[in-house]
């Protein structure tokens, strides 16, 4: 683990809670229906853009990290619970940056949410793989605690090897767009699925919808 990841994650969590620094981030999470309980459970934070009020944090240990500016942040943990990276979901559009960004880590060997949900996944002997981190968090908040993210439509054989320790059934549910269809086809073309039962769930959501938006619509 990079030695300052815990420190940086704490900075983002404090920024989100700050009445002025975190306002944009909190407003965004409110529009997504994310509760305070969920924010605390998943250690969600906010990477503020530009100048920080002098009364935010005067401690020398906190520095103005910039890679994830304008993003809601999530710590990424391995299945053993060790923090491997921090990811950010874009809220403020900056240049041509991708929707999700993160510090380098071995994304082929980590699934977002597996650590938090592994007990339910083992109990149900089933896991749902989706693209976005907010899909996982929204599902958890609404009681569906067997979901993990492959950081986009990028499920790998390494992921399958890890999943096999917890579940025998995998439902791959990617977005109904080109990237989602490409990712689903890639899983279909794997050289082997081992002893896993893999369901490639296509055509479930209407165009431009994902698991997160579907859950919000059908949980009302």
What does each of the following model-derived ranges do?
Residues 1-62, 71, 83, 93-102, ...:
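Non-catalytic accessory segments of DNA primases and related replication-initiation nucleases
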Residues 1-2, 48-166, 183-184:
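Phosphate-handling DNA/RNA-contact segment within nucleic-acid enzymes
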Residues 29, 81, 172, 211:
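A residue-level signal for conserved active-site and pocket-lining positions in enzyme catalytic cores
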Residues 129, 167-179, 203:
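Acidic beta-strand-to-loop metal/phosphate-binding motif
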Residues 147-153, 196-207:
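RNase H-like polynucleotidyl transferase catalytic core
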Residues 156, 173, 179-189:
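Active-site-proximal loop/helix of nucleotide/amide-processing enzymes and allied scaffolds
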Residues 162, 186-190, 210, 214:
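Alpha-helical scaffold elements adjacent to nucleotide-binding pockets in ATP/GTP-utilizing enzyme cores
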Residues 200-220:
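Metal-dependent DNA phosphodiester-chemistry modules and their immediately adjacent helices/loops
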